[in-house]
From Swiss-Prot:
It catalyses: ATP + H2O + cellular proteinSide 1 = ADP + phosphate + cellular proteinSide 2. It comes from the Bacteria. It is an enzyme of class 7 (translocase). The keyword Nucleotide-binding applies. It comes from Staphylococcus epidermidis (strain ATCC 12228 / FDA PCI 1200). It is a peripheral membrane protein. Part of the Sec protein translocase complex. Interacts with the SecYEG preprotein conducting channel. Has a central role in coupling the hydrolysis of ATP to the transfer of proteins into and across the cell membrane, serving as an ATP-driven molecular motor driving the stepwise translocation of polypeptide chains across the membrane. ATP binds at Q84, G102, E103, G104, K105, T106, D496. This is Protein translocase subunit SecA 2. One of its GO terms (biological process) is protein import. InterPro entries: Helicase_ATP-bd (IPR014001), Helicase_C-like (IPR001650), P-loop_NTPase (IPR027417), SecA (IPR000185), SecA2 (IPR022490), SecA_DEAD (IPR011115), SecA_motor_DEAD (IPR014018), SecA_preprotein_X-link_dom (IPR011130). HAMAP family: SecA (MF_01382). Its EC number is 7.4.2.8. It is found in: Cell membrane; Cytoplasm. The gene is secA2.
């Protein structure tokens, strides 16, 4: 019933898009008769029209799309099909276009990118990795340039490349920019750490199309981008706590909730810890760090798996993205968790760095005036797209009917019998010369199947995170005659597997999946490796009762039935009742997994709200300071009065010594005036005296700065230094606080409410500390000039 209603709604949306499509098609013949010069001149015509008439882009959409369509035919030899036009219209309107593998999403995106770039405000195509961004940029660059638009790759594809001054500015200030979500996110954070308007390089974020949008803003939504700063004081407890954790018994001394990714000590475990570390109670205030370390060690040991969440490369822990199977080099878990895993694996413990800046992909893309996306599996995430981003998903029909045969699951009592059946199936397919792609959940399983196939004289390509450099080549070869490719769920997403004619004739690509993934969208993505653009092929998932999905997310005890474990595998597989029961267990487990993941993303989004609001306010204030041409209207005396009024109230400045010490610390290193004539019982008299000292010291520094530009730079840098030092500390504190409240077992206490309450309190404290730092910087900084005559500021 629900499926039928959804289809009706989708058809209504498509009807609206087809009305616009008909307008574009009506222009096809006219535009095909244009000379190259006339067609190229359209870009300038559109820009002039938009500027002169202040018109919306919708007014010129049919003509703009007809222009790109005809230009694509002439420049690329590709003429966008009607279904691609539908997807392009949907994306310009800010929707998610669900387009199946091989339907030409790269070409589809050129139309809304071109249209939105006509405003002069820029348009981005954002994808998941460098290879895809560079590939799409190189393929589409001739089209944009022929039409008179500038296009760039938003990064230099050289490892450890150091950008020259203004180089990033040049890369980003093009009409159209191709980049990745990770690179754009880090550049956004870096741009907002600039202390000079000339060091900023990002333009205002106008319009973006996100490729594989569900992977980026749903699956990766909980992964924050983090820029690290100075190292924290390193604890020496990691190895000691690791040894203690090894003495604990699961379910007796601690409880693990794998689904919620939580772990905590029981009363017995707490007593054991107190006894082990020879303290009265580990929950005394002075042992807070010890409790934190115990929880970190437990999380490292029980919630993170080698070869699934991380692996060891060159003696270092390298994280793996569970969803894509890709390595995340240079990325570290925060708040000491990375170091706990290093201790667990006996590798050298790295420095735990403080957090300078952070943002999630959810909030990164909310910085755009508008964004849309495309994916092959959007419908399954439609509710979340709407709840989090107010985006609807429009299912775009395929140009050719999907010929792939998605066969029913094959079910087994245990993993050993299932693995034997998978190997027999792959060998059987290989004997027919039909190419096969075997996809596994983990790198460990992929390595096992690859090795077993080699033992049976079946040559194969192994594609896992550790050899991702060969990904594109392996995937390109996966559709060749007799090819066998074993891969994790990364499986070359975004890269088409093209079939030779011989392979097409013998049934296309066979996709064998060794277990259901936690998310039905990922299952669909993996099946979609076969059957592109009406190609033949088939997919099949093999299931056992001890699959990770079933063990983690199902409470069924069917796997413990000894009769099932001893039954002949073929008889069991042919049992309709058994298959029905297992299908029900798997479907329910996957549903629970998806619901839990959605709740976790909602929770992450709730946690992010506080820091998001604070970050937006801080970044807006920084930009206001950077863009200021003078500070003539800024009331510095009122700033000083606010600070001194609070300090006189909260600090004991009622003695001459206390007042002089305060002046040394905040206003002047060389103060030598007599304060004996000040009435120490009169707060206003003390405040007036401090304001007088502030004004004198501030003016002294302005005199050193000499000209108006240097005075401006001194004030800007002093204020920014105050904001940044306190904001960096606030961000780090909020990261630590989030980790702390996640570890607490607070009964009915709402941890989100608690987090927001503390976050607001600390923000208010931070705001006062920023003012105090501003006063100190304006009074205590030392201004000097280097041999080139450039001003150098030494802050207190």
């Amino acid at each position: 019933m629900a499926k039928g209603v959804n289809q009706i709604i989708n058809n209504i949306r498509l009807r609206k898009l087809r009305k616009i499509l008909n307008q574009i098609n009506a222009l096809s013949e006219e535009f095909s008769n244009f000379s190259d010069e006339a067609l190229q001149a359209k870009t300038k015509e559109f820009k002039v029209y938009l500027n002169d008439n202040k018109a919306s882009l919708n007014h010129i959409l049919p003509q703009a799309y007809a222009t790109v369509r005809e230009a694509s035919k002439r420049v690329l030899g590709m003429y966008p099909k009607d279904v691609q036009i539908l997807g392009a219209i949907a994306m310009h309107q800010g929707n998610i276009a669900e387009m199946q593998t091989g339907e030409g999403k790269t070409l589809t995106a050129t139309m809304p990118l071109y249209l939105n770039a006509l405003t002069g405000k820029g348009a981005y195509l954002i994808t998941t990795n460098d290879y895809l961004a560079k590939r799409d940029f190189l393929e589409m660059k001739p089209l944009y340039e022929w039409l008179g638009l500038s296009v760039s790759l938003g990064f230099v594809d050289i490892p450890e490349y150091e950008y020259a001054e203004n180089e990033k500015y040049e890369l980003y200030h093009h009409d159209i920019v191709y980049t990745t979500n990770g690179r754009l996110g880090f550049d956004y954070l870096i741009d907002n750490l600039a202390d000079d308007i000339r060091a900023k390089f990002l333009p205002k974020l106008n319009f973006a199309i996100i490729d594989e949008v569900d992977s980026i803003i749903l699956d990766a939504a909980q992964t924050p981008l983090v820029i690290s700063g100075a190292p924290r004081v390193q604890s020496n407890l990691f190895h000691i706590v690791k040894k203690f954790v090894e003495t604990l018994e699961k379910d007796k001394d601690f409880i693990v909730n794998f689904n919620k990714k939580e772990v905590w000590l029981t009363d017995e475990g707490s007593e054991k810890a107190s006894h082990y570390f020879k303290v009265n109670s580990i929950y005394q205030q002075q042992y807070f760090d010890l409790v934190r370390m115990i929880h970190l060690s437990l999380r490292a040991k029980y919630l993170f798996k080698y070869n699934l969440d991380y692996f060891i490369f060159d003696g270092e822990i390298v994280l793996i993205d569970r969803i894509t199977g890709r390595m995340l080099p240079g990325t570290k878990l925060q708040s000491g968790l990375h170091q706990a895993i290093e201790a667990l694996e006996n590798v050298e413990i790295s420095q735990d760095m403080s957090v300078m800046a952070t943002i999630t992909f959810q909030n990164l893309f909310k910085q755009f005036d508008e964004f849309s996306g495309m994916t092959g599996t959007g419908k399954l995430g439609e509710k979340e797209f709407f709840d989090l981003y107010s985006k609807v998903v429009i299912e775009i029909p395929t140009h050719s009917p999907i010929e792939r045969d998605d066969r029913p699951d094959r079910v087994f009592a245990n993993g050993d019998k299932k693995n034997d059946a998978i190997l027999k199936t792959v060998i059987g397919i290989h004997e027919t010369q039909q190419p096969v792609l075997l996809i596994t959940r983990t790198a460990e399983a992929a390595e096992y199947f690859s090795a077993e196939l080699f033992k049976r004289d079946i040559p194969n390509n192994l594609l896992i995170a550790q050899n991702v450099a060969k990904e594109a080549q392996m995937i390109a070869e996966a559709g060749q005659l007799s090819a066998v490719t074993v891969a994790t769920s990364m499986a070359g997403r975004g890269t088409d597997i093209k079939l030779s004619k011989e392979v097409h004739d013998i049934g296309g690509l066979a996709v064998i999946i060794n277990e259901h993934m936690d998310n039905s969208r990922v299952d669909r993505q993996l099946r979609g490796r076969s059957g592109r653009q009406g190609d033949p092929g088939y997919s099949q998932i093999f299931v056992s009762l001890d699959d990770d999905l079933v063990k983690r997310w199902s409470n069924s005890n069917l796997a413990e039935n000894k009769n099932l474990q001893t039954m002949d595998a073929s008889k069991l597989e042919s049992s309709a009742l058994f298959k029905k029961r297992v299908k029900s267990i798997v479907n329910k487990a996957q549903r629970v997994s998806e619901e839990t993941a959605m709740k976790n993303r909602e929770m992450a989004n709730e946690f992010e709200k506080s820091i998001s609001v604070q970050r937006d306010k801080i970044y807006a204030e920084r930009n206001h300071i950077l863009e200021a041409s003078d500070f003539d209207d800024f009331n510095f005396e009122q700033l000083a009065r606010d600070v001194f009024t609070k300090d006189v109230k909260n600090l004991d400045l009622s003695s001459e010594r206390a007042l002089v010490n305060y002046i040394y610390e905040n206003l002047s290193f060389v103060f030598d005036e007599d304060v004996s004539n000040i009435n120490m019982q009169n707060d206003e008299e003390i405040i007036q005296f401090l304001i007088q000292q502030f004004t004198q010291q501030f003016n002294n520094r302005l005199e050193v700065a000499a000209d108006s530009y240097l005075k401006l730079r001194f004030i800007q840098k002093s204020i920014l230094k105050a904001i940044d030092s306190e904001w960096i500390e606030q961000v780090d504190n909020l990261q630590q606080l989030k980790a702390s409240v996640n570890n607490r077992q607070n009964g009915q206490r709402n941890v989100i409410f608690e987090y927001h309450k503390v976050a607001l309190e600390t923000y208010e404290y931070m705001s006062e500390d920023i003012k105090r730092k501003m006063v100190r910087n304006l009074c205590l900084s030392i201004l000097a000039f280097d041999k080139d005559g450039d001003m150098v500021i030494h802050f207190p």
